[in-house]
Amino acid sequence: MLLKKRSPTSILGTLALTGIVISYMIGGGIFSLPQNMAASASAGAVMLAWMLSGIGIFFIANTFKTLSIIRPDLKAGIYTYSREGFGPYVGFTIAWGYWLCQIFGNVGYAVITMDALNYFFPPYFAGGNTIPAILLGSLLIWIFNYIVLRGIRQASFVNIIGVVCTLIPLLLFILITARFFKFSIFKTDFWGTAPQHTLGSIGSQLKSTMLVTLWAFIGIEGAVVISGRAANPSSVGKATILGFSGCLLIYVLLSLLPFGSLFQYQLAKIADPSTAGVLNILVGKWGEVLMNTGLLIAVLTSWLSWTILASEIPYAAAKNGTFPECFAIENSKHAPSFSLFMTSGLMQITMLLVYFSSNAWNTMLEITGVMVLPAYLTSSLFLVKFSLSKKYPKQAAIKARIAMITGLLGSLYSLWLIYAGGLQHLFMVAILLALGIPFYVDSGIRHKQEKTFLNRKEILKMTIMALAALLAIFLFSANKIHL
């Protein structure tokens, strides 16, 4: 009997992958959920918003799980799903956009980390764009670069420790707010329709809270992105569902329990991070310190996860010939060294730019949040396409009809997310994605794949993207749309 030798890069189990999914989703924003949700919605609307978002994002999570089962040969998920389903240019565009999203997102974590640190050392890091903040943020960029260079296994171990340290203060917050929970307070004006309140209809409350909930699940694709590092393909789907379920439960409890100890109008006035403000009211100063410490750990942990994923997509794309082949270079620890250094270098440049304009940076963060959404759409559409093809395995554990329904509902919810992200941000994304066209063309020529990369279909797709970018530039320059 022959034993299949496991690749030295395939070293992540279900626990490590789940840790990456959780840390990728749970960033600093979770510590502001109580106020963010209560600012424009009642307890009833918040509960309904999480229910609807949970159902929608479940189909995206299940899309990734299904694809990991029926197509375990496709590594680095969102990139390879897009390429396999819709050609090399769409695959490149998804990889390019996702990479930019990670770079800007990581620098966003640097800014948030420095701002969180300012609680302990005011005023040196206020706003996250002071000189001390830029220097320390830059140092952390290269520290995380070094950690990941030591190997994905070691980085994921550090990540698991960070996840545990993040969850401890969140669980303490849940226990404390549960201890002070009073149903008489919770049920007061449950739907926010009392005359003295200005929350509006349930529909308007839902709309405002859904905009908060939709960003809470960005990162659910974490296990899929590094599926090439998984010890067992089945672990990818398990980690995705476990991470989704765990985060949803935490989000719901963190958002709803405070409504049982404080009234909606009180929660709406608490400064961010509002979990710290809530505990300061309930148990005193130590609760505030605890949550601010948790915020700092959460952001650093997410930053590490995003560093791992930011280097993985260009690495996978380079191995398939879509990105320049230098991005596929590994070190002796099987870490994507060139991709890491290039990613960290671009993060460093962006970090320096933050010093000159923090307001423009906030807008860029919103745009890059939208940039990941097309990857959800193309992955879901690929599942629909594959489930309808003759290539779908007849003996698959998941029936083709179930896979098709999952992909279809995931596609519809992805379209809703893109719409909710805002038309102005979508146009800006078109400009950023179009910037990758020269690199795609160059890669096709260098790899002598003109017939595949530059055939009529791919040229048509590039033309549509270029025209969308030109339209966006015109609309912005004519002040027809604004960021």
UniProtKB/Swiss-Prot annotation:
Q: Name one GO cellular component term.
A: plasma membrane
Q: Does the keyword Translocase apply?
A: no
Question: Which GO biological-process labels does this protein carry?
Answer: amino acid transport
Q: Which UniProt keywords apply?
A: Amino-acid transport, Antiport, Cell inner membrane, Cell membrane, Membrane, Transmembrane, Transmembrane helix, Transport, Virulence
Q: How does it sit in the membrane?
A: Multi-pass membrane protein
Give the signal peptide as a residue range, or say none if absent. Answer: none
A GO molecular function held by the record: antiporter activity
Q: Name one Pfam family in it.
A: AA_permease_2
Transmembrane helix listed as a keyword: yes
Could you tell me which InterPro entries the record lists for this protein?
Answer: AA/rel_permease1, Amino_acid_antiprt, APC_superfamily
State the compartments where it is located. Cell inner membrane
Question: Transmembrane segments in this chain: where?
Answer: 11-33, 48-70, 90-112, 127-149, 156-178, 209-228, 241-263, 293-315, 335-357, 367-389, 415-435, 458-477
The superkingdom listed in its UniProt entry is: Bacteria
- PANTHER family, alphabetically? AMINO ACID TRANSPORTER-RELATED (PTHR42770), ARGININE_ORNITHINE ANTIPORTER-RELATED (PTHR42770:SF4)
What does the UniProt record say this protein does?
Answer: Catalyzes the exchange of L-arginine for agmatine. The arginine uptake by the bacterium in the macrophage may be a virulence factor against the host innate immune response.
UniProt similarity note: Belongs to the amino acid-polyamine-organocation (APC) superfamily. Basic amino acid/polyamine antiporter (APA) (TC 2.A.3.2) family.
The name under which this protein is listed is: Arginine/agmatine antiporter
Coding gene?
aaxC
